[in-house]
Regions:
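Short linear motifs in intrinsically disordered
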Residues: 47-54, 134-136, 367, 381-384
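Short Pro/Gly-enriched beta-strand edge/turn motifs at strand-loop
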Residues: 41-53, 123-130, 300-312
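Rieske [2Fe-2S] iron-sulfur-binding domain
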Residues: 51-159, 163-173, 177
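Non-catalytic accessory segments flanking enzyme active sites
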Residues: 13, 18-64, 68
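Generic structural signal for secondary-structure transition and capping sites
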Residues: 39-43, 90, 212
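C-terminal catalytic domain of Rieske-type non-heme iron oxygenases
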Residues: 77, 144-453
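Basic/polar N-terminal segments that are highly enriched at the extreme N-terminus
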Residues: 1-10, 451-453
C-alpha cells in the first residue's frame, strides 16, 4: 500500500493535493480497504423502480460481495432483502430477475414471501418442536438502509448512514436532468453487463469531469462527424461543475432561449413542453440563460450518467438525437470492473423517439459502442501499468487547472453566469477528478464500518 511518501496517510495526502500515487488503480490492499471503509458505508446504486413495475417483480443486484433481492411485494412496496437463507446461508434467489410470489431455498426448502417473511419450513414441528425450537415469525435480513430518488434505488450497508437526500445534497439538482423529463420520470432498458480489466475509479473519474480526453481519445468519432460539436474548442468552452456528492461536464450551446436550445440537441416540442413542467425555473436557466447542457456526470462513488446528442441520420446535417445512459462501475477486484449500463428515456416520450434514442445509445455506448472501445483501451492500459513495482514510485499529476501555488488558472463562474449549485468553471481542468478522489480519501481514512458479531 505504501506510495512515494510511505503508508496509507501519505497516499491519501498526495491524493488530496492532486498528485495521485499511480498504484491506487491496482492495489489489492487498497481494494480491501475500499470494501470495508467505502462500500460498507456509502449509498450505492442498485437499480431503478421501472425495472420492477409489477407486484411480484424482482431483480437481484449486488453491493460488491453482498447479493440483494430488490422486489416489489404483493403490497406494491419495493424492498431490498439480503439474498441469504436464514438456515444455512444458501442464496434464496438464483435468477437475475423475474416475477414470483415466493422464494424457496433449494438447499432445504425454506420458503419466503416476496416481502421477505418466512412462510414455509419443512417439518417445522418434527425437526424443531414448532415455535418452541425455532420461531417461524422471521424475515430475510433487510438492507440496513434502502431509499430512492426519482426512481433510482440505493442501498447503504451502514445502519448509521445519513438519509439518501442528505448524502446526495445539491447534486440532486443535476440528477433531475437525467432522471426527470416528465411527471412520470424515466424508464430503463437493460442493464447490459460486461467486464473490463480496469480499476473502477478510472471510469468514475472520466465521467465526472474529463473533457480533456474527448478530442484525442475519440478523434476517430470526431473525424466521421458523429459529434454535432466537432471542435476541441467546444469542450473547452463547456463548464464542469461539482456539487456536494457529484459533478459533471456540460457543452456550451449556441445563442437562443430554452426551447431553441433544447431543439438544438434534438428534443421534440412535445417533450420540451413536459420538461418545462417538471424542471424548476433555476434548472431551466442553466440551459436557457447560461447556455450549458449537461453531458457526462458521476455521483460518488461509482454511479455515472451520459447525456449526448449524436448525428445519427444520413441526409440531414443538422439532425441530432439525444439519449441518456446510466451506468454503474461495479468493482470485482483491484483490477477488474463489471460495467452495468442502462438506457434511460422519458416514460412519456413517443414510441418512435424511444426507439430512435435507443439506437443512438447503442451506437455510442454499451458493450459495443464506439465511445466505449476508445475509453476502455486507455483504462486497461492504466490499470495494467499501475500494478507494477515502478508505479509505486510515480505520482500522477492531476492538478490541471491549478498554478503551483494552488490558485485556479480560470476562476470559478459567478452565480449569474452559472445558475446551478456548487462550483462551476470553464476550460480544461481536473477539479472534479480531484474532488472525487478527495472524497474517496476521506472514506478510506475513517475506521472500518461496524458489523454485528
Amino acid at each position: 500500500m505504501a506510495g512515494p511518501d510511505g503508508g496509507l496517510l501519505g497516499v491519501l495526502e498526495n491524493v488530496r493535493r492532486g498528485m495521485i500515487p499511480a498504484h491506487i488503480y491496482n492495489d489489492p490492499e487498497l481494494f480491501a480497504l475500499e470494501k470495508r471503509r467505502l462500500f460498507a458505508r456509502a449509498w450505492t446504486f442498485v437499480g431503478h423502480e421501472s425495472e420492477i413495475p409489477h407486484d411480484g417483480d424482482y431483480m437481484v443486484r449486488r453491493v460488491l460481495d453482498d447479493s440483494f433481492i430488490i422486489t416489489r411485494g404483493s403490497d406494491g412496496r419495493v424492498r431490498a432483502l439480503f439474498n441469504m437463507c436464514l438456515h444455512r446461508g444458501m442464496q434464496v434467489c438464483r435468477a437475475e430477475l423475474g416475477n414470483a410470489s415466493n422464494f424457496r431455498c433449494s438447499y432445504h426448502g425454506w420458503t419466503y414471501r416476496n416481502d421477505g417473511r418466512l412462510t414455509g419450513l419443512p417439518f417445522h414441528r418434527e425437526a424443531y418442536g414448532g415455535d418452541d425450537g425455532f420461531v417461524k415469525d422471521q424475515t430475510l435480513l433487510p438492507a440496513p438502509n434502502f431509499a430512492g430518488y426519482n426512481g433510482l434505488l440505493f442501498i447503504s450497508l451502514d445502519p448509521a448512514a445519513p438519509p439518501l437526500q442528505d448524502f446526495l445534497g445539491d447534486f440532486r439538482f443535476y440528477l433531475d436532468y437525467y432522471t426527470r423529463q416528465s411527471a412520470g420520470g424515466v424508464e430503463l432498458r437493460g442493464p447490459q453487463r460486461w467486464r473490463i480489466r480496469a480499476n473502477w475509479k478510472i471510469g468514475a473519474e472520466n465521467f465526472a469531469g474529463d473533457m480533456y480526453h474527448t478530442p484525442h481519445t475519440h478523434a476517430s468519432i470526431v473525424d466521421i462527424g458523429l459529434f454535432r460539436e466537432p471542435k476541441a474548442q467546444k469542450r473547452k468552452d463547456g463548464a464542469t461543475y461539482w456539487a456536494h456528492r457529484g459533478g459533471g461536464t456540460t457543452y456550451k450551446l449556441p445563442p437562443g432561449g430554452f426551447e431553441e436550445r433544447m431543439r438544438y440537441v434534438g428534443y421534440p416540442d412535445e417533450m420540451i413542453g413536459r420538461i418545462k413542467q417538471v424542471w424548476t425555473p433555476r434548472q431551466q436557466r442553466v440551459v436557457g440563460e447560461d447556455g450549458f447542457m449537461v453531458s457526462a456526470a458521476t455521483c460518488f462513488p461509482n454511479l455515472s450518467f451520459v447525456h449526448n446528442w449524436p448525428k445519427v441520420r444520413d441526409g440531414r446535417d443538422d439532425e441530432t438525437l439525444p439519449f441518456i445512459s446510466i451506468r454503474l462501475w461495479q468493482p470485482i477486484s483491484e483490477n477488474e470492473t463489471e460495467v452495468c449500463s442502462w438506457f434511460a428515456v422519458d416514460s412519456a416520450a413517443p414510441a418512435h423517439y424511444k426507439q430512435d434514442s435507443y439506437k443512438a445509445y447503442l451506437m455510442c455506448f454499451g458493450s459495443t459502442g464506439m465511445f466505449e472501445q476508445d475509453d476502455v483501451e486507455n483504462w486497461v492500459s492504466l490499470t495494467t501499468t499501475a500494478g507494477g513495482s515502478m508505479a509505486r514510485r510515480l505520482l500522477l499529476n492531476s492538478r490541471m487547472g491549478l498554478y503551483d501555488d494552488g490558485r485556479p488558472v480560470v476562476e470559478a463562474l459567478a452565480p449569474s453566469a452559472f445558475h446551478g449549485p456548487g462550483r462551476a468553471q470553464v476550460g480544461y481542468n481536473e477539479h472534479n477528478q480531484r474532488a472525487l478522489l478527495a472524497m474517496w480519501a476521506d472514506y478510506l481514512q475513517e475506521g472500518d464500518a461496524c458489523e454485528n458479531r
